[in-house]
């Protein structure tokens, strides 16, 4: 029984997702339906948490909009998420960056990860 469920979940999972980690700055293209038409809306911010649960995986992105912190959680394999693009890699030493909620301005910046040679 569980093999059938795993096979169905594997079939529904997206295969073309980029590798990203907490601290990375990403642009998530989200499908937004307005009336009878559909358009893409970009949400750019820092990944503060990732939840890996197969088909039920999710990640949280935080950005500052008009001086106000905005967090949005996306289901990784959702059909609403059109694409994910990694803008820059962040060098962090935590899996969950919830401490960024208390920081503002320059204190909330994350160093860029240097490429390995």
Curated annotation (Swiss-Prot):
GO annotation (BP), single: translation
Pfam families in the cross-refs: Ribosomal_L19
One GO CC term, this protein: cytosolic large ribosomal subunit
UniProtKB keywords: Ribonucleoprotein, Ribosomal protein
The keyword Lipid biosynthesis is assigned to this record: no
PROSITE patterns in the record: RIBOSOMAL_L19
GO molecular function: structural constituent of ribosome
Function: This protein is located at the 30S-50S ribosomal subunit interface and may play a role in the structure and function of the aminoacyl-tRNA binding site.
Family in the record: Belongs to the bacterial ribosomal protein bL19 family.
HAMAP family (UniProt xref): Ribosomal_bL19
Protein name: Large ribosomal subunit protein bL19
Source organism of this protein record: Vibrio cholerae serotype O1 (strain ATCC 39315 / El Tor Inaba N16961)
